Amino acid sequence: MEVTQTKAEGLSRTFAVKVPVSELQAKLDARIEEIRPQMRLKGFRPGKVPAAHVRKMYGRDLMGEVIDKLVNETNQKALEENSLRPAGTPNVDMQADIEKVVTGKEDLSYQMHVDVMPEFTPVDVSTLTIVRPVAEIADEQIDEALKRIADQNMKYEPRAEGEASQDGDAVIVDFVGKIDGEAFEGGTAEQQSVVLGANRFIPGFEEQLLGVKAGEEKELNVSFPEDYPAANLAGKAAVFETKIHEVRAPQTPEMDDEFAKGLGLESLEQLRGLVKDQLANEHTTASRSKAKRDLLDKLDAAHDFDLPPGMVDQEFEQIWQQLQREMDAGRVSDEEKAKPEETLRDEYRKIAERRVRLGLVLAEVGRIADVRISEAEVNQALIREARQYPGQEREVVQFFQKNPNAMAQLRAPIYEDKVVDHILETAKVEEKTVTREELFAEDEE
C-alpha cells in the first residue's frame, strides 16, 4: 500500500492511495476464511464450503466489503500518520476502474480529499470583559401584564336592543360568501363570532360590520388579497350575505381579589407576585441572551484563522436554504428581497464564516476547560424533543438513538450553552442598566 500527500493548500489536503491487487486478494482470502465456518450451503457440510466455491458465489460482494473497509482504514491511517484532525468526512475520488479492481485485474487507486481543522490558540477568556444588560421591573410593567391577563379573560355581554356595534364588539353572524353569484367552498358559516378590529378576516369584512344591529341583514363587498393562501380565491371580488344575530360588547373584568380567586389564587397580591416572577424570568433570559451575543462578538473579533472550506460551504447551504424557505413563506422584508442575489450570497457567506469560526473557538475553549455534557442533560433534551410530537414519543427517541448525526445535533446546543456559561463565570462581567425595550430589542446576525 502506498499513501502519498499530493496537495497541501491552506486547510485542504489530498492524498494519493494505491493498493496492489495482491494485497486486495490477500484481504479477500482472509475475509472468505472468516465467514466460511458460518456458511450453510446445500450439498456441503456446515462450515465446510470450499473457499473456491465461496469466492465464485460471493467473491464480488465480499471484494466490495474489503474495498470499503480498506478505504476507511487507509483514510484514517493517513490522517493519524500526518497528525491531522479532519473537519468532516473525507471525499474519495476513485482513479481506478472499479470493475477491474473488483475482478482482481487492476490495483486499487484513488485520491482522498479532506479539509483539516485549523490550529489556533483561543483567547484567554478570563481577560474578556462582557457587558450584561439588566432592566428593573417597574410597577407599570406589572400593571400592563395584568391588563393583558384581564383582556385574555374578557367576556362579551349583549348590547341593549337596537344598539349598534362598535369597534371591539363581538358580532354573532351567519354568512354566505359568493363570487360571481356562486357560493364558494369555505365561505359559509353560522353563528360565527366576529370581533371587530381584530383583523382576523379579510380586509373590509370587519369594517363593514361596524354600526350593525341585531336582526339586520347586510351585504359585504370585499376583495381577497392577491397573496391569499387559497389560490382559487386570491385577488377575487366577493360578496358576503350576512345575517346579524347578536351584538355583544366587551366587558373587561375588574382586577381584584375576586378575579385572582377565579384563576385559582388567593389574592390579587399573589397574582402580582407571580406576574413579577414571570417578568423576572423573562428579564434573566433576555439578559443572558444579550450577554452571550456580546461574548460571541468579542470572541469573533479576537480570532482570525483559516476556516475549513467544506464546513463553511455546508453552513452556508443550510443558511441559504432557510432563507429561501423564509422568502417562499413571505417572511422576508422587501428591502432584503430587493438585494441582488450576489449581494445576499456575500452577506450570508460572512454569517456562515462567523458561525463556523465561533463554533471552532467555543469547541476549543470547552476542550481546554474540560466542559462535558452529562447523560442526564442529553436525556432531558431528548424528552423535550419527543414531547413536541405527541403520540410519537417512542419513535422520536428511537430515531435519535439510531442516528449519530441527529444525536450530535441534539448535543451541540447543550454543549455550546455550557461553554458559554463557563466563559461568563470566568470572564469579567459588567452589568449595564437599560430599559425593558432595549433589553428585548432584537439583535441582527
Swiss-Prot record:
Can you cite an annotated GO cellular component?
cytoplasm
Major subcellular location class: cytoplasm
Please list the residue ranges annotated as the PPIase FKBP-type domain: 168-253
Q: Localized where?
A: Cytoplasm
Q: What is a GO molecular function of this protein?
A: ribosome binding
Answer whether the UniProt record assigns the keyword Isomerase to this protein: yes
Please give the catalytic activity noted in the UniProt record: [protein]-peptidylproline (omega=180) = [protein]-peptidylproline (omega=0)
Q: What class of enzyme is it?
A: isomerase
Q: Does the keyword GTP-binding apply?
A: no
Q: Which UniProt keywords apply?
A: Cell cycle, Cell division, Chaperone, Cytoplasm, Isomerase, Rotamase
PANTHER family assigned to the protein according to its UniProt record, in alphabetical order: TRIGGER FACTOR CHAPERONE AND PEPTIDYL-PROLYL CIS/TRANS ISOMERASE (PTHR30560), TRIGGER FACTOR-LIKE PROTEIN TIG, CHLOROPLASTIC (PTHR30560:SF3)
Its function? Involved in protein export. Acts as a chaperone by maintaining the newly synthesized protein in an open conformation. Functions as a peptidyl-prolyl cis-trans isomerase.
- Put simply, this protein is called Trigger factor
Q: Where does this protein come from, organism-wise?
A: Hyphomonas neptunium (strain ATCC 15444)
